[in-house]
């Protein structure tokens, strides 16, 4: 069994335990701390990648969202800077989505 399946099984077992026996303050606090830790890690990475995006935005005089639309549509070249910029932009957006998911906003 792979790690993700094992983790999902543990989460389901925990859900069943809480439904049957009620809330456990220790479990609730542990889960909150794990989520807070992961959210903080994502925030740090988002900030770091955001700084990298700003370097490209200043160098090429356009916002990353505008660049990515043009790049995806093939309207600008595919030099190494653009490939790197595109990758960083996509990583940045994926991390934002993950963070929002952990925060329960999506």
Where in the sequence are the language-model features?
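Short, compact, well-ordered microdomains
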Residues: 78-104
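Short E/K-rich amphipathic alpha-helical oligomerization segments
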Residues: 54-76
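Small, basic N-terminal interaction modules of short regulatory proteins
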Residues: 1-58, 62, 97-106
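Generic serine detector
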Residues: 28-32, 64-65, 72, 86-87
